[in-house]
Amino acid sequence: MTTIIGIKARDGVVLASDKQASMGNIVEDKRAQKIIPITDYILLAGSGTVADLQHIAKILKTELKLRELYSRRTMNVIEAANLLSHLLYQNRFYLNPLGLLIAGPINSKEFGIYSLDGIGAISEIKDYFAEGSGGVIALGTLEAEYNPDITVRDAIKLAEKALKSSIARDVFSGYGIEIYTITKKGVEKLFLEAQK
């Protein structure tokens, strides 16, 4: 399990996760990548089984690349979310439970975040969302401090605070914080150490 967070800001979006991967009650990895770049401008974050996340991310990367080659245009996050939904539904009997956030540009001025469950149901995130074993803990901080006019810069601070809260209380979250931003400037990655 884990904690992943998505925050929609007025000038972009923020995805954040902890770095711990667990196998039962054992810490399997302290540097797990739970946010995966799908394209140069679309990111996928996942809670659940890391192998399933990596598998579905590889398929999504390939399918999006093929669609971009055939159509000779860049796919937006809405198209990526719909494709991901289809892939999850096709594989619904083979994957362990997953919680996913996909983020990226809708057009040249807007950015979006979509939540998907393990069988492909999609929800557009209009403000913020937290998923995983520590998600409910992170939601308390997000609900108390989110502002609809938040900037990406402030959303980074809010994501960090919410993840630190989750890491302090959830035994399946920990060992660092990874934050990505998507703005008109592109995708940027931050890594922050956190106390366990």
From Swiss-Prot:
Belongs to the peptidase T1B family. It catalyses: Cleavage of peptide bonds with very broad specificity. This is Proteasome subunit beta. One of its GO terms (cellular component) is cytoplasm. The 20S proteasome core is composed of 14 alpha and 14 beta subunits that assemble into four stacked heptameric rings, resulting in a barrel-shaped structure. The two inner rings, each composed of seven catalytic beta subunits, are sandwiched by two outer rings, each composed of seven alpha subunits. The catalytic chamber with the active sites is on the inside of the barrel. Has a gated structure, the ends of the cylinder being occluded by the N-termini of the alpha-subunits. Is capped at one or both ends by the proteasome regulatory ATPase, PAN. The gene is psmB. The lineage of its organism: Archaea, Nanobdellota, Candidatus Nanoarchaeia, Nanoarchaeales, Nanoarchaeaceae. It comes from Nanoarchaeum equitans (strain Kin4-M). The formation of the proteasomal ATPase PAN-20S proteasome complex, via the docking of the C-termini of PAN into the intersubunit pockets in the alpha-rings, triggers opening of the gate for substrate entry. Interconversion between the open-gate and close-gate conformations leads to a dynamic regulation of the 20S proteasome proteolysis activity. It is found in: Cytoplasm.
